[in-house]
Regions:
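Long, basic/Gly/Ser/Thr-rich N-terminal segments
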Residues: 1-214
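Conserved NTP phosphate-binding and transfer environment spanning the P-loop NTPase/kinase superfamily
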Residues: 2-60, 67, 332-447
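Generic recognition of stable, solvent-exposed alpha-helical segments in well-folded globular domains
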Residues: 110, 211, 215-219, 261-265, ...
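Flexible loop/turn segments at secondary-structure boundaries
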Residues: 135, 213, 261-264, 274-276, ...
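Short acidic, glycine/serine/threonine-rich loops at helix termini
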Residues: 137-143, 267-268, 313-317, 336
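N-terminal pre-Walker A segment at the start of P-loop NTPase domains
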Residues: 213-246
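Glycine-rich phosphate-binding P-loop
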Residues: 248-279
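Conserved nucleotide-sensing/catalytic segment adjacent to the nucleotide-binding pocket
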Residues: 279, 284-377
Length: 447
């Protein structure tokens, strides 16, 4: 079945030839099958390793089966977070991003051919998935080595995947992600590298490392931006929440911003001190803390966590922006949860999930419960700053399924402190109010 299905797809000729040469080709049917692939079978511990020329066997990641999911760790601290300089463009179309040929002594067509040669020697996962939501999204495809099941499972949770039995015989992807982890060592000196190769009909992403942030997450966002640029619409880097006040008033807020700009915090329940007060701020000069009493809180109904589709088909003509989530799951960073009781909402979701989750950069022992405040150590006494969990949005209570009309738009900017002695652009302060027609001005600083 898998062979006929895969070879019946509308694929580039070079990829089709690689798939014909490859060993086993697995097209996953269920999420449970995906988690089994992540473990490499029925064992509780699995090493994701590859034979690399002149280096021998290299363990890129370890996967442990816990009671509440699988826990992925990377032996190399460098691989535990996205390298901000890992994205390159392989084509000659217009871009403001660095081109591959300007950074590395390699030709894109040669590299592309070598990737297909390598994939043709592997057992493979071939997984259809959606780029964007299931109504307005675009067909995508992941081609990855079979032992990288956790990567495929993470992408499936983030974007949603099509089970083998539901894939049409003439499935033609608009975007393809190729995963080739060994190339990090053989071609790029150990660096994280993700290369985008764009054309009008196909957007290819070559992912040369197993941390999913630059490819399964940001890579898919890049695909959406490229398609939107061609078609005249945008995917905003934004969280969106519908707020229902104690008086049954409803307000929908969309908050844009770069990493650290407060997007995920928008859809989190507010953190309280043991006495119920809320710590609003700490004066970095004096150490004084500002606390707030808030006896009644609003209900938060999340709409988007990080990627908001602003597709023309969603717009209602009311002059208010209408958005929908571009993701099926959220790549949540939980570095702020350092002890039990910090965030009961997420702790409950992660300790007792409806189905097993995929955790990264957290301590995990076979058969135990992965606790999200036990972060992997980068060095003795130095916890990894990037512990993650991939949370399918269908597991989140109160989540809004479908589109939402935005009432208020805000923009978050992470800034350094601004003092009289050391002035900085932190002077922009906590809140600026400006007309929607000037939103583009703030968006210039977004990635």
């Amino acid at each position: 079945m898998s062979r006929e299905l895969v070879l019946g797809m509308g694929l580039p000729a070079e990829l089709r030839a690689a798939l014909e040469r490859a060993g086993e080709r697995v097209v996953p049917e269920t999420r449970e099958e995906m988690l089994e692939l992540a473990m490499g079978g029925k064992d509780d511990c699995f090493e994701v390793a590859y034979d690399v020329a002149e280096r021998g066997r290299v363990v890129e990641a370890t996967v442990v089966r816990c009671r509440n999911g699988v826990v992925v760790n990377y032996p190399e601290a460098y691989m535990r977070r996205r390298d901000p300089n890992c994205m390159f463009i392989g084509d000659e179309a217009a871009t403001d991003k660095p081109r591959l040929r300007d950074e590395f002594p390699v030709e894109m067509e040669t590299l592309r051919g070598e990737v297909f040669d390598w994939l043709g020697q592997q057992d493979l996962i071939v997984m259809p998935f959606m780029v964007g939501d299931d109504r307005l999204g675009y067909p995508g495809l992941l081609v990855a080595p079979k032992n990288a099941g956790f990567f495929a499972g993470g992408l499936a949770d983030l974007q949603g995947f099509g089970p083998a039995s539901a894939v049409p015989a003439d499935y033609t992807p608009r975007a393809i992600i190729y995963l080739a982890p060994t190339f990090r060592h053989t071609h790029f000196g150990g660096r994280q590298v993700v290369v985008h190769q764009r054309s009008e009909a196909l957007h290819e992403v070559f992912a040369f490392n197993l941390y999913p942030g630059p490819s399964a997450k940001k890579g898919v966002y890049g695909i959406l931006l490229d398609i939107g640029e061609q078609e005249g619409w945008v995917t905003a880097h934004a969280s969106t929440v519908r707020v229902v006040t104690p008086y049954d008033n409803t307000l929908t807020i969309m908050h844009e911003g770069a990493s650290g700009g407060g997007k995920s915090e928008m859809i989190e329940q507010i953190h309280r001190e043991p006495d119920g007060r809320i710590k609003l701020a700490t004066n970095l000069e004096t150490g004084d803390e500002i606390r707030l009493h808030l006896t009644e809180t609003s209900e938060l109904q999340p709409v988007t966590d990080d990627m908001a589709l602003c597709h023309p088909a969603l717009q209602s003509g009311t002059r208010r922006l209408v958005v929908a989530d571009a993701e099926e799951g959220w790549f949540l960073r939980i570095n702020h949860i350092r002890q039990y009781g910090t965030d009961p909402h997420h702790e409950r979701l992660c300790v007792h999930p409806p189905e097993g989750l995929i955790f990264m950069n957290l301590e995990g022992a076979p058969g135990s419960t992965c606790l999200i405040w036990e972060h992997t150590m980068d060095a003795p006494g130095v916890p990894c700053p990037n512990p993650r969990v991939i949370m399918p949005r269908r597991f989140v209570p109160g989540v809004v399924n479908g589109a939402a009309e935005v009432d208020v738009r805000s923009f978050g900017v992470r800034t350094p402190p601004c003092t009289a002695a050391h002035p900085s652009y932190g002077i922009i302060g906590m809140l600026h109010v400006l007309p929607a027609s000037l939103a583009w001005l703030w968006r210039l600083v977004a990635p």
